[in-house]
């Protein structure tokens, strides 16, 4: 049995992973860690660690991991360039999987959106994400991943073409503009729409998550897989083989 440590165990995703691991036949919980816990114990007793914490928590985890390398599955969103660079550096001595969404359906959405962006070159692109009222970051990490993918498919630099809101008399939409909009309310687990719009027709690709168990089960499958991999950075495409 693979021993999985949950970093950020008191959060919504941490609790969901704990619940899903109770019925898992290939893995079991080693340590439930939250802020103020014993990091040394977490690393000593775990074969792999799943992180759904906060940017500051992920930063602390990566710094400690250099002293006791273990496979890390990181699903925390809102990470800045400094933390992403630290993650890349740490992957030289341990396998690290990073994704803003652990859903296999979202991975396919990302793949399809990239292909559609290439094929529908004259279509306007708009991205809409919806989440529960408690979500702290906006746009969602998944929405930004989708935006990066469709921009890259058109050889565009996202930071130069992204629009995060519209208000007042702003003029016509530019050709390369990619809007990423956020809605918050209720208990929506997650919904992402990538729309491609042209005169006379439009195509919308949608993914809706109805339960956090979707992300938790995905993270567990990835953790089991990652425990057998060599030191480097991995993405959802590596896991799926696409």
From Swiss-Prot:
Belongs to the DapB family. Gene3D superfamilies: Dihydrodipicolinate Reductase, domain 2, NAD(P)-binding Rossmann-like Domain. PANTHER family: 4-HYDROXY-TETRAHYDRODIPICOLINATE REDUCTASE 1, CHLOROPLASTIC-RELATED (PTHR20836:SF0), DIHYDRODIPICOLINATE REDUCTASE (PTHR20836). It catalyses: (S)-2,3,4,5-tetrahydrodipicolinate + NAD(+) + H2O = (2S,4S)-4-hydroxy-2,3,4,5-tetrahydrodipicolinate + NADH + H(+); (S)-2,3,4,5-tetrahydrodipicolinate + NADP(+) + H2O = (2S,4S)-4-hydroxy-2,3,4,5-tetrahydrodipicolinate + NADPH + H(+). The lineage of its organism: Bacteria, Pseudomonadati, Campylobacterota, Epsilonproteobacteria, Campylobacterales. The keyword Signal does not apply. NAD(+) binds at residues 8-13, 75-77, 99-102. It comes from Campylobacter jejuni subsp. jejuni serotype O:6 (strain 81116 / NCTC 11828). It is found in: Cytoplasm. Pathway: Amino-acid biosynthesis; L-lysine biosynthesis via DAP pathway; (S)-tetrahydrodipicolinate from L-aspartate: step 4/4. InterPro entries: DapB_C, DapB_N, DapB_N_CS, DHDPR_bac, NAD(P)-bd_dom_sf. Keywords: Amino-acid biosynthesis, Cytoplasm, Diaminopimelate biosynthesis, Lysine biosynthesis, NAD, NADP, Oxidoreductase. GO terms for cellular component: cytosol. Coiled coil: none annotated. GO terms for molecular function: 4-hydroxy-tetrahydrodipicolinate reductase; NAD binding; NADP binding; oxidoreductase activity, acting on CH or CH2 groups, NAD or NADP as acceptor. The active site is at 131 (proton donor/acceptor), 135 (proton donor). NCBIfam families: dapB (TIGR00036). The keyword Translocase does not apply. PROSITE patterns: DAPB (PS01298). One of its GO terms (biological process) is diaminopimelate biosynthetic process. (S)-2,3,4,5-tetrahydrodipicolinate binds at residues 132, 141-142. This is 4-hydroxy-tetrahydrodipicolinate reductase. It comes from the Bacteria. It holds the Pfam family DapB_N. It is an enzyme of class 1 (oxidoreductase). Its EC number is 1.17.1.8.
């Amino acid at each position: 049995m693979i021993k999985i440590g949950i970093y950020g165990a008191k959060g919504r995703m941490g609790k969901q992973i704990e619940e899903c691991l109770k019925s898992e036949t290939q893995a079991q919980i080693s340590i439930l860690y939250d802020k103020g816990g014993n990091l040394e114990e977490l690393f000593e007793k775990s074969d792999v660690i799943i992180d759904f914490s906060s940017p500051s928590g992920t930063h602390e985890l990566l710094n400690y991991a250099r002293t006791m390398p273990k496979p890390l599955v990181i699903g925390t969103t809102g990470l800045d360039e400094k933390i992403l660079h630290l993650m890349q550096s740490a992957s030289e001595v341990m396998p690290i999987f990073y994704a803003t969404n652990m859903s296999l359906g979202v991975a396919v959405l990302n793949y399809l959106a990239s292909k559609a962006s290439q094929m529908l070159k004259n279509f306007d692109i708009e991205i809409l994400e919806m989440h529960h009222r408690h979500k702290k970051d906006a746009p969602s990490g998944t929405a930004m991943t989708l935006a990066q993918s469709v921009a890259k498919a058109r050889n565009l630099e996202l930071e130069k073409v992204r629009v995060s809101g519209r208000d007042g008399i702003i003029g016509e939409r530019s050709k390369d503009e990619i809007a990423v909009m956020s809605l918050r309310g209720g208990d929506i687990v997650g919904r992402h729409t990538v729309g491609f719009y042209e005169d006379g027709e439009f195509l919308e690709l949608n993914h809706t998550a109805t339960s956090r168990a979707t992300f938790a089960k995905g993270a567990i499958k990835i953790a089991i897989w990652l425990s057998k991999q060599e030191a480097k950075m991995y993405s959802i495409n590596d896991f799926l083989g696409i």
